[in-house]
Amino acid sequence: MLEVSNLTAIRDERVLFENLQFEIKPGELVQIEGRNGTGKTTLLRIITGLGDREEGMIKWKGEEVEKSRDVFHQDLLFLGHQTGVKRELTAFENLRFYQSIQNNSTSDEEIFTALTQVGLAGREDVPVAQLSAGQQRRVALARLWLSKQILWILDEPLTAIDKQGVKVLEALFAQHADNGGIVMLTTHQDMFADSPKLRKIKLGD
């Protein structure tokens, strides 16, 4: 379970959110809503440890994340605004690299399957620098199909993704929740309209 209590963030003397509290349980899909500038990305970065908070506490599995950082990061997959892919490597090599640093045992076939899921079949050996922005985003998203992490935190994962790609990702997110995972994301698109697993947390007015 992810627990956030009394979380406050201030940027340039402006309060983005104050005394924010929520709990997220395994099996939930959580969409962070709010206008631009209300702190959606800031919230995700604070939870992942990449951003600073004014005050508040974040717990994972009952432990403060600062005291169990290694365990938390083993359970976390974070995809931010930037794709995080290495432009000099191919799509296949990028996924192989990420799996190796996470000490995940992954076969070549599993990597090819993940790239097929995101519509990159036939582009596996193309250097990422030669792919479009949307295709580079897909390389990053392919990590989700290989992920063994429980907690997925995704900042605008649907950017530059077509309608069919959105449907595929929506199904993957729902499957992850069904398997006891947690998906926490920001997006400007309507998703999971009929899902009882969906929760929305709104920032700002």
Curated annotation (Swiss-Prot):
Signal peptide: none annotated. It is found in: Cell inner membrane. GO terms for molecular function: ABC-type heme transporter activity; ATP binding; ATP hydrolysis activity. It is an enzyme of class 7 (translocase). It holds the Pfam family ABC_tran. Its main location: membrane. It comes from the Bacteria. Residues 2-204 form the ABC transporter domain. GO terms for cellular component: plasma membrane. It is a peripheral membrane protein. Keywords: ATP-binding, Cell inner membrane, Cell membrane, Cytochrome c-type biogenesis, Membrane, Nucleotide-binding, Translocase, Transport. It catalyses: heme b(in) + ATP + H2O = heme b(out) + ADP + phosphate + H(+). Its EC number is 7.6.2.5. One of its GO terms (biological process) is cytochrome complex assembly. ATP binds at residues 34-41. The keyword Cell membrane applies. PANTHER family: ABC TRANSPORTER I FAMILY MEMBER 1. Part of the ABC transporter complex CcmAB involved in the biogenesis of c-type cytochromes; once thought to export heme, this seems not to be the case, but its exact role is uncertain. Responsible for energy coupling to the transport system. The complex is composed of two ATP-binding proteins (CcmA) and two transmembrane proteins (CcmB). Belongs to the ABC transporter superfamily. CcmA exporter (TC 3.A.1.107) family. This is Cytochrome c biogenesis ATP-binding export protein CcmA. The lineage of its organism: Bacteria, Pseudomonadati, Pseudomonadota, Gammaproteobacteria, Vibrionales.
